[in-house]
Structure formats: structure tokens, C-alpha cells
Amino acid sequence: MKRWTALGRAVAMAAILLCGAVAQAEPTDNCAVPSYMLLGDNALDHVHAAVEKNKTFEIVALGGISSTLPGPDGATFGYPARLQAALSRLLPSVKVNVSVVTQPRQTAEQMVDGIGQLLLDHKPSLVVWQTGTYDAVHGTDPEEFRSAVAEGVEKIKEGGADVVLVNMQYSPRTESVVAMSAYADAFRWVSREHEVPVFDRLAIMRYWYDQGQFDLYKATKDMKIAKSVHECLGQALGTMIVDAAHLAAPEGTPPRQ
């Protein structure tokens, strides 16, 4: 029990690192991501049809505590809000709305139970489903985790929406404490088998850290880093979605091969 308490503290601290800024987020030059991390072959056909026909784009961001920042205006600076801003810039003729549904301290299996009602309530073209951290902390069997994610993906698709999976966030402080690799592999498996995109937040944040774009150790003392990380995640996710939906070629995006 003490072991899980320590793990929970470590992951909670990692979430706080990236949820500490409450100042206005602005675009940053540190957002560079290799194109191979964002561009893939799995298409978002429902998104394409909805945007082309209705010029509206309804998204639900389903996730845990790392979806938003603390404080009364914290939701404004989390990556879902930054995603809405990014998509509005990329698709200026489209009305974009991102609703955030936060379900903290839930496993993927628990989150699946609420997907049907979520689809009825919001009628989205796209669900951005962030999961994995709580399962990793509590040692869910990776095969059971994979099965739960696959079930959730099928529910979303059967409900008439597309899905983008978002995996765990990277923190150098928890890297040696919580084993994430098996869960990252599960995301990749579901992506291949069910032909859905994965926004590899774990690899992207690790890349930024390794390249010195963000000092995620320093984030414990300099919480302003959090707003920049969320801004960059929103921009990168927006680029990935626009590409997967074949809506436009964002400026600076290399041509698809």
C-alpha cells in the first residue's frame, strides 16, 4: 500500500508540474515536433464530413487532471482550450468548440462506462481520449488496459464519432518510478488494429525535454513552463487532427509522402 501511495504522489506531482501556470498562454517557438510524431495514415473521416458539410467542429476532450490547469480560469490554459485556439487559427471558416469532460482517478475501463452518455450529451464529431496514467500507477495488467481502450474506441466509433487517443505525459521525475512503456505499446496496438490516430504525448514531451526545449525538472519551481507546454500540446494536436482529417495543409507542415 505504501508503494502505491508513493507512486500516486509522484504522478500527482508530475501533473502539478504541468498544471501550475495561471497566466495567459501565448504561442511559443519551442513547439517544434518532428513530423513523424504527428503525421500518419489513420484518417478522421467523420471529422472531415462534418467540417466540410456544416462548417462546425464539435470536440470532446475526455481525460484526467492533466487536461486543465488549476485556478478559476485554469481551463482556459489547458491543452484542450489551446487546441480549440489552434484549430480556430488553422480552420478560420469553421466554428470550433472543444468541451472538456474531466474524470480524474479513473482507469480506462471505468471511463468506458460513461462514453455512451458522453456521446448523447455532446454529439461530437471527435473524441480526444486521454488515458493511461491512472492505470500505470495502479499496475493494471497491460493486456486488460489494451482491451479496455479498444472497447472504448469501438464504442466511440459505433456512436458516430472519430477518436484520437492521447497517451500519458512525460515527467523525468516519475520516469524511474512508474513503468509507462507497456501502456504506450498498448496504445500503438489499438491504433494499428482499430485504425485510429494516437497523439503520442509521452514521446513528444520526452523529445522536448531531451532537446532542451522545456526543462521539466525546473517546472517544479518555475510553473510558467506549464502554460507553454500546454500551448505546444494544443498546437501539435491541432496539426495532427487537421492532417488526419484531410482538411488543409497547415503552414509549415511538410507534404505527405
Question: What positions do the PLM features span?
Answer:
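Bacterial N-terminal signal peptides that target proteins for export
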Residues: 1-12
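Active-site segments of SGNH/GDSL-like serine hydrolases
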Residues: 130-133, 152-184
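Serine-esterase "nucleophile elbow" of acetyl-processing enzymes
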Residues: 28-100, 115-123
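Internal alpha/beta domain cores that form substrate/cofactor-binding pockets in large enzymes
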Residues: 58-61, 94-122, 134-165
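Cell-envelope and extracellular/periplasmic
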Residues: 29-34, 100-106, 128-137, 192
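Catalytic His-Asp segment of secreted/periplasmic serine-dependent ester chemistry enzymes
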Residues: 170-257
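Bacterial N-terminal signal peptides
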Residues: 10-20
